[in-house]
UniProtKB/Swiss-Prot annotation:
Subcellular locations according to the entry: Cytoplasm
Gene Ontology CC terms, in alphabetical order: cytoplasm
Cofactor binding, per record: Binds 1 Fe(2+) ion per subunit.
EC id: 2.3.1.234
Listed PANTHER family: TRNA N6-ADENOSINE THREONYLCARBAMOYLTRANSFERASE, TRNA N6-ADENOSINE THREONYLCARBAMOYLTRANSFERASE, MITOCHONDRIAL
Record's protein name: tRNA N6-adenosine threonylcarbamoyltransferase
């Protein structure tokens, strides 16, 4: 079975072909990072224009690299939520058009769900597991009991961790995106700046929730004092942020007696986060799964693979009236597509 995956939820135009027997046949991504650098973040209208310009060339290249004719594709998977609506509609429109012209099933995929199952492309992972989702727009914990069996545990109350990285990098004059540059700079610094770990010991209603706005504000105050080097501030911020991510995840694993954890999203590429979870494998007797670096950021491969799993395991497809959603939690998404499925 061959599935085409289309991803345009933010600022990356990505298309991939996944074959159930041969694996990934292609994975083409057109990045817009350079375009958005001057804005210090993603500018929605610019992202939409670039998607419109890039989507057909990226699609053609993905099919060419896979040595596949569109007529031989068995299904069209596309990210439908969450994301920038002006970006989502580009990919959804192309997916609907291909589905209609070539009479192929239209398979809806949730962006966060795709990030989580990206690790399944290269690893065999047993259920149940805890999923820690860390990206520019999301910081969430889920209990995953099976495919489409998702329980939301908690999320950020303000900034996502990737957003905090971007803002701290901007404060330090390091440019965009902030995650990679802070990760690199922190290797040259020392953890000498005393910074808070928000909600790290909370056992009440915010036990599995996150908050990074206070940490961000504390960093700003230290920068304004002018006492510490940029390298030390970057290192101390990274230590604080990753401490919280690790502690909350381990707490969830203990609460539900889970031994496996999947770390997903763009921030899963962070070297210190990987180091800390590696240490936790020995200290807590857990197994941590990270996607390979090329599958950490947005890509079509994760969409194609997740679309394959949906088509194979639940057969859920939608008709052309299905629309993208800017905000939609992963567990709620499953409820919606089941009600909307044309094959249920």
């Amino acid at each position: 079975m061959k599935i085409l995956g289309i991803e345009t939820s933010c600022d990356d135009t990505a298309v991939s072909v996944y074959d159930s027997e041969e694996g990934l046949l292609s994975n083409v991504v057109s990045s817009q990072i350079k375009m958005h650098e001057e804005w210090g973040g993603v500018y929605p209208d610019l992202a939409a224009r670039e998607h419109t310009k890039n989507i057909i060339p990226v699609l053609d290249r993905a099919l060419k690299e896979a040595s596949v004719n569109i007529k031989d594709i068995d299904g069209i998977a596309v990210t439908v939520a969450p994301g920038l609506i002006v970006s989502l509609v580009i990919g959804i429109s192309v997916a609907k058009t291909l589905s209609w012209i070539y009479r192929k099933p239209l398979i809806p995929v949730h962006h966060i769900e795709a990030h989580i199952f990206a690790s399944f492309i290269t690893e065999k992972i047993d259920y149940p597991f805890i999923a820690l989702v860390v990206s520019g727009g999301h910081t969430e914990l889920y209990l995953i009991k099976g495919f489409e069996d998702y329980r939301y545990l908690g999320g950020t109350l303000d900034d996502a961790v990737g957003e905090a990285y971007d803002k701290v990098a901007r404060m330090l004059g390091l440019g965009y995106p902030g995650g990679p540059v802070i990760d690199r700079l922190s290797k040259e610094g020392e953890d000498t700046v005393k910074l808070p770990r928000p909600l790290i010991n909370d056992r009440g209603k915010n036990r599995f929730n996150f908050s990074f706005s206070g940490l961000k504000t504390a960093v700003l105050r230290e920068i304004q004092k002018g006492v510490y080097r940029k390298e030390d501030i970057a290192r101390s911020f990274q230590e604080a942020a990753t401490d919280v991510l690790l502690a909350k995840t381990i707490d969830a694993m203990k609460e539900f007696n889970i031994k496996n954890v999947v770390i997903a999203g763009g921030v899963s590429a962070n070297s210190r986060l990987r180091e800390k979870f590696k240490e936790a494998e020995e200290n807590h007797g857990i197994k941590a799964y990270f996607p390979p670096l090329y599958l950490c950021t947005d890509n079509g491969a994760m969409v194609a693979f997740t679309g394959y799993k949906r088509f194979k395991e639940s057969g859920t497809t939608v008709d052309y009236s299905f629309e993208g959603k800017a905000r939609l939690r992963m567990d709620k998404f499953v409820e919606i597509i089941r009600k909307s499925s044309v094959s249920s």
